[in-house]
A protein has these predicted regions:
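Glycine-centered helix-boundary capping/hinge motifs
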Residues: 141, 161-162
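Terminal recognition/anchoring or ligand-binding modules at protein termini
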Residues: 123, 140
Length: 184
């Protein structure tokens, strides 16, 4: 407890120099109070998720720019954070899943892969994201990488669920895409 107090005291001294940020103690909780002049991308993202404000393509691009900077509280695992992290991850996956199909694999394969990767970061066994990523990789003629992504996904699926992923690579990949594969 004293280590926490020392850390907060140091934090307060640093933040004293910034007029727009304050550390408050209220009802046995520390609160970081930001003035309206302060922009915090994390809080902006949280507001967008709570209000379900990601409705248009420009909204999505702004939202994606924020979340693509990294996983929320990466590496932190405290019981009191679990519900919060789960809310952020699930809400983020919902938004990403809603918008991924607005991008054409033929015209924007790289963007589809980026969005699929972001979904898989938040939900490592998301089958929809796997399908989008594999389709985009095959469209780019990255057959070996598509197979590698599939194999990694299957290993993780086996580890998480204790059973094999139910679909083979050939079942996952639409036949017209497989016929594009050049002989090796």
């Amino acid at each position: 407890k004293s280590l926490r107090s020392v850390s907060i005291l140091k934090l307060r001294k640093i933040l004293e120099r910034i007029d727009t940020v304050e550390v408050l103690f209220n009802a046995n909780r520390y609160i970081l109070q930001l003035s309206e002049d302060v922009y915090c991308d994390y809080l902006a993202c949280l507001d967008w998720l709570k209000d379900k404000r990601v409705r248009t393509q420009p909204d999505f691009e702004y939202f994606y720019d924020i979340i693509s900077k990294g996983e929320v509280f990466k590496g932190e695992s405290f019981d009191w954070m679990d519900d919060f992290k789960s809310y952020i991850c699930n809400s983020t996956v919902d938004v990403l899943s809603r918008f991924i199909d607005t991008y054409s694999i033929e015209d924007e394969a790289d963007r589809v892969i980026q969005i699929a990767d972001q979904i898989l970061l938040n939900d490592p066994c998301n089958e929809e994201a796997l399908l989008y990523k594999i389709k985009a990789l095959i469209y780019q003629n990255n057959f070996k990488l598509a197979r590698y992504v599939y194999d990694r996904f299957c290993a993780l699926y086996q580890e998480m669920y204790g059973e094999a992923f139910p679909s083979s690579f050939e079942q996952v990949v639409p036949s017209p895409l497989m016929s594009q594969q050049s002989p090796q």
